[in-house]
């Protein structure tokens, strides 16, 4: 789930100098971090090639490629990533062994991107556009009518037999956009994805049948 703040940190750099998105990094392939992913990226960067930051953001956000993430993460000074967390007022417990974060805390990334409260409007829109291309059709997007825009990011974490599968996003409902965050624990990622899908469908239906109250900035 740290892919979203990593993306934000790079786009914050690009506010000052858009040329940073053309900076290139070389992937030597000595370590394949996608091997630990249960949900494999449909597309991933290839060993022996150079990629621009723009391309790496695409692989990291759209396909959840851990190798692209590693290149971007390792090129960020820790203080820059911490500045994102502090500047966005996200309740993040960095002292915990697993760097835990609450549903409310993580949803803060999406609230502030939607309202352009940390990045400027151009870069906030760029971030949301990347998130609408995320390749995880079996989660939140599966629970809403086809064609409904969803700007979302999923994440997984495995510890022993336990599987954690989470997804957060903005669903652009015809009545108004809303944030949805779902965290699951279990032993079968497929079943957990189905839970996310079913909850997404339930919430979409409830909003369709009701009259949601608009929150700040038009967000429900």
What are these regions (language model features)?
Residues 64-67:
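Internal, conserved structured core segments that host functional sites
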Residues 44-59, 69-220:
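Penicillin-recognizing serine hydrolase domain
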Residues 2, 8, 12, 29-31, ...:
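A mature extracytoplasmic/lumenal domain signature
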């Amino acid at each position: 789930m740290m892919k979203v703040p990593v993306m934000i940190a790079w786009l914050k750099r690009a506010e000052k100098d858009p040329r940073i998105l053309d900076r290139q990094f070389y992937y030597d392939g000595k370590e394949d971090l996608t091997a630990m992913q249960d949900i494999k990226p449909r597309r991933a960067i290839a060993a022996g090639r150079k990629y621009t930051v723009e391309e790496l953001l695409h692989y990291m956000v759209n396909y959840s490629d851990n190798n692209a993430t590693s290149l971007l993460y390792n090129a960020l000074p820790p203080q820059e990533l911490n500045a994102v967390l502090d500047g966005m007022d996200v309740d993040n417990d960095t002292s915990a062994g697993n760097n835990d974060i609450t549903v409310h805390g993580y949803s803060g990334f999406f609230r502030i991107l939607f309202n352009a409260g940390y990045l400027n409007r151009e870069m906030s829109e760029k971030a949301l556009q990347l998130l609408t291309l995320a390749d995880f059709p079996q989660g939140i997007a599966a629970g809403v009518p086809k064609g409904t825009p969803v700007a979302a990011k999923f994440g997984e974490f495995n510890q022993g037999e336990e599987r954690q599968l989470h997804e957060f996003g903005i669903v652009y409902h015809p009545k108004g956009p809303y944030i949805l965050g779902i965290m699951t624990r279990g032993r079968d990622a497929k079943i957990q994805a189905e839970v996310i899908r079913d909850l997404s469908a339930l919430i979409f239906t409830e909003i369709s049948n009701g009259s949601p109250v608009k929150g700040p900035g038009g967000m429900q």
